[in-house]
């Protein structure tokens, strides 16, 4: 089967890392990129140099108005567009069947569907969506309906970390209820120094100077991808001054009591079996920087987990909120194309 051809709208953190993941995995072909604020020479520079993930290990250049990206194994010849209106991007002309909507702007079905006017067949929103169906690889991707799901969401990076872990625990032991905290790395929406921030005043405080309590819909979103957990999970975030890698703390009550060894065994089995490549298991004494560039959605930290009793436990899982998530965007497209 030929590789699915994709376009990327928005060449920011996720857009660029989706391209890196696509080149690395070699399961899709990127044929077009659109960003109204970045010209092709700047795209070359931004893709080549990355303060968090290091220099791109392949070769990138601008030739004949196209972005040429190769890593020695495969070459992507990418048409570049600079349109603000998604309906005006000629995805069909470029051969892009799947569009990754990674601007963070067009997250509703109505707005994201503008890509279909340009000839795209499917749109994958790389953010949570209020009205598009959300799919998390390893959790509910088997519910994808190719005939009817044209605009879908890959959920959030935090939901992609939490949901696989919650599924394993719920399937094996039953989750009665739970609270999640994500200790989350800085993202582009934060301020470098104190500045105005609408109603959520704390969000406007300097990212490099503070631990900032923040809201997140990631835990509630698990209820959308695992209906049995709807209304049973909620959570919050603490934004911290690190550039990448976040960690989920899931504290939950279990229906069926379990020792920590039994919980670890269940996660380890899933990581080696049905969730291989999505969920990972470690017993090493790791810290956040050890996971920069990790392609998994969720890395269970066996040594960091604790229990008060067999029915009340705190479970810890790491995730590269940039690169791990970008890998799942590519995987979701590959999966959908195979249906």
Swiss-Prot record:
UniProt entry tagged with the keyword NAD: yes
Keywords: Cytoplasm, Glycolysis, NAD, Oxidoreductase
Record-linked CDD domains: GAPDH_I_C (cd18126), GAPDH_I_N (cd05214)
InterPro entries to which the protein is assigned, alphabetical: GlycerAld/Erythrose_P_DH (IPR020831), GlycerAld_3-P_DH_AS (IPR020830), GlycerAld_3-P_DH_cat (IPR020829), GlycerAld_3-P_DH_NAD(P)-bd (IPR020828), Glyceraldehyde-3-P_DH_1 (IPR006424), NAD(P)-bd_dom_sf (IPR036291)
Binding sites annotated in the UniProt record for NAD(+): 13-14, 35, 84, 321
Gene Ontology CC annotations of this record: cytosol
GO molecular function, one term: NAD binding
Highest taxon in the source lineage: Eukaryota
Annotated family: Belongs to the glyceraldehyde-3-phosphate dehydrogenase family.
Protein name: Glyceraldehyde-3-phosphate dehydrogenase
Record lineage: Eukaryota, Metazoa, Ecdysozoa, Nematoda, Chromadorea
């Amino acid at each position: 089967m030929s590789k699915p051809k994709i376009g990327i709208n928005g060449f920011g953190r996720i857009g660029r890392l989706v391209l890196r993941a696509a080149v690395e995995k070699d399961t899709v072909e990127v044929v077009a990129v659109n960003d109204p604020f970045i010209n092709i020479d700047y795209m070359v520079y931004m893709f080549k140099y990355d303060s968090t993930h290091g220099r791109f290990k392949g070769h990138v250049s601008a030739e004949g108005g196209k972005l040429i990206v190769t890593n020695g194994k495969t070459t992507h010849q990418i048409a570049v567009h600079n349109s603000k209106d998604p309906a005006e991007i000629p995805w069909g002309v470029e051969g892009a069947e799947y569009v990754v909507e990674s601007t963070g702007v067009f997250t509703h079905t109505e707005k994201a569907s503008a890509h279909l006017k340009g000839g795209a067949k499917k749109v994958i929103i790389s953010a949570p969506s209020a009205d598009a169906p959300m799919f998390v690889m390893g959790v509910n991707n088997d519910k994808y309906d190719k005939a009817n799901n044209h605009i879908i969401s890959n959920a959030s990076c935090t939901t992609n970390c939490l949901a696989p872990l919650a599924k394993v625990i719920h399937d094996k032991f039953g989750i009665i209820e739970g609270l999640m905290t994500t200790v989350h790395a800085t993202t582009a929406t934060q301020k470098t120094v104190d500045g105005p921030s609408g109603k959520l005043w704390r969000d406007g405080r300097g990212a490099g100077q503070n631990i900032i309590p923040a809201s997140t819909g990631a835990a509630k979103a698990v209820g959308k991808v695992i209906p049995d957990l709807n209304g049973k999970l909620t959570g919050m975030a603490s934004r911290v001054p690190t550039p990448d890698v976040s960690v989920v703390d899931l504290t939950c009550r279990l229906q069926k009591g379990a020792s920590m060894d039994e919980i670890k065994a269940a996660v380890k089995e899933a990581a080696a079996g049905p969730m291989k490549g999505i969920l990972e298991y470690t017993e090493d004494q790791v810290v956040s920087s050890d996971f920069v560039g990790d392609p998994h959605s969720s890395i269970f930290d066996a040594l960091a987990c604790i229990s008060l009793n067999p029915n009340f436990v705190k479970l810890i899982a790491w995730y590269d909120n940039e690169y791990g998530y970008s890998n799942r965007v590519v995987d979701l497209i590959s999966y959908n194309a195979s249906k």
